[in-house]
Amino acid sequence: HLIYTEGNFRLAERAHVDGPVPLSSLLAHFNELTGLALTQDHDAEIHLVEATLPPEGYELTITPEEIVIRAAGEAGWRHGLVSLAQWARQHGESLPCLTVRDAPRFGFRGIFLDCARHFHSIATLKRLLKQMSLYKFNRFHWHLTDDEGWRLEIKAFPQLTAVGAWRGHGLAVGPQLSGGLDPYGGYYTQSEVRELVAYAAGLGITIIPEIDIPGHCHAAIKALPELLVEEADRSRYLSVQYFDDNVLNPALPGTYEFLDAVMDEVCDLFPGSQVHMGGDEVPTGVWTDSPACQQLMAEQGYQDCRELQGHLLRHCQQYLARKGKQMLGWEEILHGDKVSREATVFAWTSFQAGLDAAASGYPVVMAPAQHLYLDLAWSQDIHEPGLYWAGTLNLAQVHACDPAPADFHANDNILGVLSPLWSELITSRDRLDYMLFPRMLATAEVAWSTPARKVWEHFVARLPGQLHILDQLQVRYRVPQR
């Protein structure tokens, strides 16, 4: 709901704000987005007022004399201040008067970044978090481990980063994707992780860590072969990414020693209530000729090797629950039918996969590749960077997706949306910008707006103002073409 009114409000660089609670964190966020220096003071021109509105809803009113943001609490005030920051970025110190009443469609509004295939610095991640906050995203899904690199310091197993964080000629993890003749890699220390978690919290964003198991574990297995390799295993398999040694063995005691230690440290580092344990792309043929796995299957009465995946993920879910955490995972966590409905399913292969999980009673985050994967190329132009395995993805396609169709009977189980950016081809900050923007703005609208208010022509009309903001922030976005 938006109504333009007459006049302008002059926003001073050091304007004062008052409110019913201490506002230092909210004002620090606003100042970070705008470069202004607002402070809290009773003699104020900007007022934050308590009101009966949805938990994340807000009402922003700008008149020539004052600015008033009404909300039920901190989340709504934050959104109102972010909208004010966008308005200030577009119009400078003379703000056109208006009234906005708004609230999000979904409570989960996420961006995913793969930092395993290519390593992205803490400075780059802070920049991304700031950009996310400007468009009211509230979850950052941090993909920290994969076949090509282990990026998180684990004090119980320093080999994970000493060995698993680096790839190159003559190293345990061989050269791949990029890096040339020199070793390539990097990892995040625990102090850096705590710093980033605190920074994100100040922007209203919760970081969800992902430790991807039981597949995508080549780097971990190379770092800890004494724990994670069964010498007698003769199983033959090949993952989608052409690894034949990237799956944890659910029958080895070392697997649980490794995972429990990792989960202990992850739970300590990330105060949020959720941990993502991957679960995707376990290849066919794994565990079939593992004596330990065959013995475990016989002991448990399992008939299908996929039940071993469920066995391992059920252990992780129960272990995390004892620490007060909820397990999240890609849609394949349902394989083997061992994970309870307290787990949240991230649907990535299709909308239908998410609808099926929601209909079965699982909470679902929608992330279908054909509609929301930002590593896909914009078009089939030979000069356009990106991947094609799920087709191409332009701005209009992102904007058009509807995660929760009106005629679906279990929409209450659909928590929100996630746009992933996998990093096989993301070798620089400029390429990161190009793949994210402006498609990330369309994801923001999908996550925030109801279908009735998500109108393509309106989005396009507002886009130049947003590109102006991105120019100010020195974002090297792709110039949009439908």
Named regions from a protein language model:
Residues 1-109, 321-334, 339, 465-482:
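Acidic, contiguous N-terminal accessory segments
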Residues 119-121, 147-153, 214-220, 276, ...:
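Flexible loop/turn segments at secondary-structure boundaries
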Residues 25, 124-127, 188-195, 254-261, ...:
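Generic recognition of stable, solvent-exposed alpha-helical segments in well-folded globular domains
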